[in-house]
Amino acid sequence: MTHILRIDASARRDGSVSRDLTTQIVDLLGGEVTIRDLTTAIPQLDEAWIGANFTPADQRTAQQQETLSLSDTLVAEVQAADTLVIGLPIYNFGVPAALKAWVDQIARAGVTFQYTETGPKGLLEGKRAIVAVASGGTEAGSDIDFATGYMRHVLGFIGITDVTFVTADRLMVDPDAAHKTAQTQIEALAA
């Protein structure tokens, strides 16, 4: 059975287009679903986290292990998933702070990627990501969209190169067209 990790980054629980899109995508794909709602506190990295992360695992104190416990859980969720479905609202041309905090918690050298003589290598190969993008005025893929390229790069960096974007962009300009485009892209996922 397919295991899906659904990640919702919108600060809005009600009326969120990206959450609506992730719901539709997950319903279409079916399978076992783990939901990670990033409106619950995902802490930003701090000095204690950095120190714990760069201490070899077998040398970490109990406090350092506790410091990394949420990060370990988040990484395990990604490792267990076959498909990630990520809700990506574009806030001020970029990703929400909560999504950036999640990325910081899961992008760990020696855990989800490693450095080699030829450069970094992602360790999460063989997974798929579907990123549901919603924006009020920013056109996905445009020169002022710093979110979709960032997500494609980060996912590729950790080894997830099969990335599909479902976009409902420019919702404040033409909501009907935005929803229609997203629906067409969602239907294509079933093909």
Swiss-Prot record:
GO terms for molecular function: electron transfer activity; FMN binding; oxidoreductase activity, acting on NAD(P)H as acceptor; oxidoreductase activity, acting on NAD(P)H, quinone or similar compound as acceptor. FMN binds at S10, S16, V17, S18. The keyword NAD applies. Gene3D superfamilies: 3.40.50.360. It is an enzyme of class 1 (oxidoreductase). Coiled coil: none annotated. Binds 1 FMN per subunit. Its cofactor is FMN. PANTHER family: FMN-DEPENDENT NADH-AZOREDUCTASE 1, FMN-DEPENDENT NADH:QUINONE OXIDOREDUCTASE. Quinone reductase that provides resistance to thiol-specific stress caused by electrophilic quinones. Homodimer. This is FMN-dependent NADH:quinone oxidoreductase 1. It comes from Jannaschia sp. (strain CCS1). The gene is azoR1.
